UniProtKB/Swiss-Prot annotation:
Region Disordered: start-end pairs: 426-455
Record PROSITE patterns: TUBULIN (PS00227), TUBULIN_B_AUTOREG (PS00228)
Keyword line: Cytoplasm, Cytoskeleton, GTP-binding, Magnesium, Metal-binding, Microtubule, Nucleotide-binding
One GO CC annotation: cytoplasm
Record protein name field: Tubulin beta chain
InterPro entries named in the record: Beta-tubulin_BS, Beta_tubulin, Tub_FtsZ_C, Tubulin, Tubulin/FtsZ-like_C, Tubulin/FtsZ_2-layer-sand-dom, Tubulin/FtsZ_GTPase_sf, Tubulin_C
Similarity comment: Belongs to the tubulin family.
Assembly description: Dimer of alpha and beta chains. A typical microtubule is a hollow water-filled tube with an outer diameter of 25 nm and an inner diameter of 15 nM. Alpha-beta heterodimers associate head-to-tail to form protofilaments running lengthwise along the microtubule wall with the beta-tubulin subunit facing the microtubule plus end conferring a structural polarity. Microtubules usually have 13 protofilaments but different protofilament numbers can be found in some organisms and specialized cells.
Top-level lineage group: Eukaryota
Signal peptide boundaries: none
Length: 455
């Protein structure tokens, strides 16, 4: 089987990671004790178990154990997961935690506290990979604004890349939001992380809390969304992206096929993700939804999980992962229509740049759904925003001593910043022919912010 090992790093990574396991366990009929629920329907049972080895290891007693490594630099989140209803699902040895925490400091996660823990994490990762017949790759859940998910998360990614250079590395990265800021040093942590992700990851699914909040307010009409609601949205996307890997389907996919179809140039592997139809936690969508409606919704900026409007850029490539009893012909027609009617939103030099796949098994609570992955040049907005905040602080050397005390040098910050700015420039270059104009605008915007910061 084509196995995938998941690594959850930091508080955010562990929370969205454990929610993902809850969702897919339910889809595969795995109970919280790890045993299959059984049932009368032999056909359903066969579908649920046929490719379950991708994410689960079957123990001798018939228990299914997630191929997951749970890492944090403090015990709090890991202990909460152990005590949760699904805590007994995981292998106890796969919980690894330090005592001191990273204190929202990337350098602590990457250089000091993280280094002490990294070898024991890699031992567990090696043990998990040895239990695989044919390892497909790794899936990492983390945030890039804190200390552990960003610092230790990127350290693990680079170490795993060294040891398994030919396996896929896919990350679900929660990016700092412009409005929902949790700590003042987020721009530093995020810039240093993006620098690592450009070099060492194959696919990065960008998610941010502001976009998730907007979905909860506008679409789901939740007045006070909590992290449970946000994690529900993230887990819907994760379940959708991975369903073709976990279930037998008409058009199956794997991490490498996804990458080959979505990444025209190796550095441009940062994706916008979306989901339709959007439903609140615990709610079900009983309205009969059609494939044309799903297609329209999935390209809507309101359904995107990152605060970046795809209409500000162009699609280099996109992938639509449909779920439910859907005819291939209908999907192909819709994809063709979208590209014909909205040709201005797609680059001309990649023909037929939407890939689609279909998985027969719908998610819980709705008869059909679609998950969307787009390689859109508008993703540069995320990086520009981080860069502007980074520059405002770095010019004053604000908060820098927290990083230099851990042994970092200023040069690392400069390198990370220029790598991220290069990435923005590359996205601009491929977005249209008027590259100079775009570049000029970005330069002016930067100079404007520099002047504001200096005044």
């Amino acid at each position: 089987m084509r196995e995938i090992v998941q690594i959850q790093a930091g508080q955010c990574g562990n929370q969205i990671g454990s929610k993902f396991w809850e969702v897919i366990s339910e889809e595969h009929g795995i109970q919280s004790d790890g045993f299959h629920a059984g049932g009368e329907d032999e056909h359903l049972k066969r579908l649920q178990l046929e490719r379950i080895n991708v994410y689960y290891n079957e123990a001798r007693d018939g228990k299914y154990v997630p191929r997951s490594v749970l890492v944090d630099l403090e015990p709090g989140t890991v202990d909460t997961i152990k005590a949760s209803p699904y805590g007994k699902l995981f292998r106890p040895d796969n919980f690894i935690h330090g005592q001191s925490g990273a204190g929202n400091n990337w350098a602590k996660g990457h250089y000091t506290e993280g280094v002490e823990l990294v070898e024991s994490v890699l031992d567990v990762v090696r043990r998990e990979t040895e239990g695989c017949d044919c390892l497909q790759g790794f899936q990492v859940t983390h945030s890039i604004g804190g200390g552990t998910g960003s610092g230790l998360g990127t350290l693990l990614i680079s170490k795993i890349r060294e040891e398994f250079p030919d396996r896929m590395m896919c990350t679900f990265s929660v990016v700092p939001s412009p409005k929902v800021s949790l700590t003042v040093v987020e721009p530093y942590n995020a810039t240093l992380s993006v620098h690592q992700l450009v070099e060492n990851a194959d696919e990065v699914m960008c998610i941010d809390n502001e976009a998730l909040h907007d979905i909860c307010f506008r679409t789901l009409k939740l007045t006070q969304p909590n992290y449970g609601d946000l994690n529900h949205l993230i887990s819907s996307v994760m379940s959708g992206i991975t369903c073709c890997l976990r279930f037998p389907g008409q058009l199956n996919s794997d991490l490498r096929k996804l990458a080959v179809n979505l990444i025209p140039f190796p550095r441009l592997h940062f994706f916008l993700v979306g989901f339709a139809p959007l439903t609140a936690k615990g709610a079900s969508s009983y309205n009969r939804i059609t494939v044309p409606e799903l297609t329209q919704q999935m390209f809507d900026a309101k359904n995107m999980m990152a605060a970046s409007d795809p209409h500000n850029g162009k699609y280099l490539t996109a992938s639509a992962l449909f779920r439910g009893k859907i005819f291939t012909k209908e999907v192909d027609e819709q994809m063709h229509n979208i590209q014909t009617k909205n040709s201005s939103y797609f680059v001309e030099w990649i023909p037929h740049n939407i890939k689609s796949s279909i998985c027969d098994i719908p998610p819980k609570g709705t008869p059909m759904a679609v998950t969307f992955i787009g390689n859109n040049t508008a993703i540069q907005d995320l990086f520009k925003r981080i860069s502007i905040h980074f520059q405002a602080m770095f010019r004053r050397k604000a908060f820098l001593h927290w990083y230099t005390l851990e042994g970092m040098e200023e040069l690392e910050f400069t390198e990370a910043e220029s790598n991220m700015n290069d990435l923005v420039y590359e996205y601009q270059q491929y977005s249209n022919q008027e590259t100079e104009e775009d570049g000029g605008e970005y330069q002016e915007e930067h100079e404007e912010h520099e002047e504001q910061a200096e005044n």
